[in-house]
């Protein structure tokens, strides 16, 4: 299998998000990289599902709550940006204060 650097990066995000979800399912609170991985993976999948940029930006604030993450993590993540592929091309999606 030959993957471009961009495809390798997306795969790494998915693997990190999967590990984070398994830890979350065991009742663990997420750390910074785990929270960012889950949010990023969900945003990429929403774009793949055909949602608009505006819908994804709104959805991005509902993925995790303060109760899902370790103390202080929500305050560390001011925004998450991801280049997502849409039917009409690649666009930068920014979610401000994603953990509420």
From Swiss-Prot:
PANTHER family: UREASE
Species of origin: Herpetosiphon aurantiacus (strain ATCC 23779 / DSM 785 / 114-95)
Alphabetical UniProt keywords: Cytoplasm, Hydrolase
Example GO molecular function: urease activity
Protein's name in the database: Urease subunit gamma
Listed EC numbers: 3.5.1.5
Gene3D superfamilies named in the record: Urease, gamma-like subunit
Pathway named in the protein's UniProt entry: Nitrogen metabolism; urea degradation; CO(2) and NH(3) from urea (urease route): step 1/1
Family, per entry: Belongs to the urease gamma subunit family.
GO CC, alphabetical: cytoplasm
Top EC class, one word: hydrolase
Subcellular location field: Cytoplasm
GO terms (BP aspect): urea catabolic process
Catalysed transformations (reactions): urea + 2 H2O + H(+) = hydrogencarbonate + 2 NH4(+)
Transmembrane annotation, as ranges: none
Subunit structure: Heterotrimer of UreA (gamma), UreB (beta) and UreC (alpha) subunits. Three heterotrimers associate to form the active enzyme.
């Amino acid at each position: 299998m030959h993957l471009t650097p961009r495809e390798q990066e997306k795969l790494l995000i998915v693997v990190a998000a999967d590990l984070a979800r398994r830890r979350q399912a065991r009742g663990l609170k997420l750390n910074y990289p785990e929270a960012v991985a889950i949010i990023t993976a969900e945003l990429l999948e929403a774009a793949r599902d055909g949602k608009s940029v505006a819908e994804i930006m709104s959805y991005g604030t509902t993925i995790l709550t303060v109760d899902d993450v370790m103390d202080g993590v929500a305050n560390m993540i001011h925004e998450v940006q991801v280049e997502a592929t849409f039917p009409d091309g690649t666009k930068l999606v920014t979610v401000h204060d994603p953990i509420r």
